[in-house]
Amino acid sequence: YCTDIGLRNAKLNFRQQEETHIMENIMYNELLCRGYFVDVGVVEFVNTKNGKKSKTQVEIDFVVNAGSKKYYIQSALNLSDDEKMNTELRPLKNTNDFFKKIIVSKTSMKPWTDEDGILHLGLYEFLLNDHSLDL
C-alpha cells in the first residue's frame, strides 16, 4: 500500500485509476492513522460438491488489531448484485470466531447489521467517524 495516493498516481502517470485498489489503499491508511495494527487474513474452508471435498482459501482484506479487539474488514467498491455480495461476505461468514466483522462499500448508506452479525458501512461513514468500527 502507498502512503500517499496522489504520489502513487503521479508515479504511474495516472494510467491505473482502479477505484477498488485506491479505496482499499485509503482504508488501509485510515486504519493505520487510527493506531491499529493491520494485516491481511486468509480463511480456509472445505467445500463439498458431488460428494467430493475440496479446500478453498479466501482473503480477508484487513485483519485489524487494537489491544484485545480484533476486526475483520472487507472493502467492496459496490455490492450491486447478489453474486458480488456473496463473494465479499464469504470470507467473513467462514471465520470460526466471534470477532467483529465489517464490510465497507462506497455506497452511501446508514450503518446496519445483517442477520449474520456483519456490520455494513458506507465508505464516508467509515472515514469520517473515528468510532465507526464500534457501531
Indicate where each model-derived feature is located.
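A cross-kingdom feature that marks ATP-driven nucleic-acid transaction machinery
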Residues: 1-135
